[in-house]
UniProtKB/Swiss-Prot annotation:
Gene3D superfamilies: 1.10.150.130, Intergrase catalytic core (1.10.443.10). GO terms for biological process: DNA transposition. Residues 1-73 form the Core-binding (CB) domain. This is Tyrosine recombinase XerD-like. Keywords: Cytoplasm, DNA integration, DNA recombination, DNA-binding. It comes from the Bacteria. It comes from Streptococcus pneumoniae (strain Hungary19A-6). One of its GO terms (molecular function) is DNA binding. The lineage of its organism: Bacteria, Bacillati, Bacillota, Bacilli, Lactobacillales. The active site is at K150, R211, Y243. Residues 90-244 form the Tyr recombinase domain. It is found in: Cytoplasm.
Amino acid sequence: MRDRISAFLEEKQGLSVNSKQSYKYDLEQFLDMVGERISETSLKIYQAQLANLKISAQKRKISACNQFLYFLYQKGEVDSFYRLELAKQAEKKTEKPEILYLDSFWQESDHPEGRLLALLILEMGLLPSEILAIKVADINLDFQVLRISKASQRRIVTIPTALLSELEPLMGQTYLFERGGKPYSRQWAFRQLESFVKEKGFPSLSAQVLREQFILRQIENKVDLYEIAKKLGLKTVLTLEKYR
């Protein structure tokens, strides 16, 4: 099915190179989601994935996909003329998240564990579950890298220079956060993080919001979406496109 994208683009007259690349990107992403067998069910799943994107991005992708679906129908590649529709809730305007001023996170705290948890999420985009699984053996301060293992997936992320001094005192342990050589639970991490953000005057900040702040800062620094996805351990950039 993927080879049909090239055939489709060949029939599009007058498209610029950038426009063709945009079509190709959107359609490859579409096929990644729906697979080789296009059906009402697979299209609904894809459409649901678009819900978090900006309306302009949704309209662009839906337009490209509908043109491609019509092309497939004309060529006899699919037995029905499928068509995607813009979800009604997409018409509601949502506020774009803003970068928060969180310099106070670097100041001393009565909740040092919560502070370090917050900084690891904010500065590296790590999930609490990933942080709790970190072993000291996974950290190399000399090369400023951290190895993250999650299920069958592994990735290497860079440790910001500012965090090196925060990690150094913990290098004699087994886990980064531990008690008696065993990692703490997620409930413990939640309580520590909650206490810390309350102390700093941000009671509504969650791990998810802090991870979003990492994404916003990366985009502010002109980091490519694919690179951000790689840092976060995401397989696609679909969930990041709403931040464009």
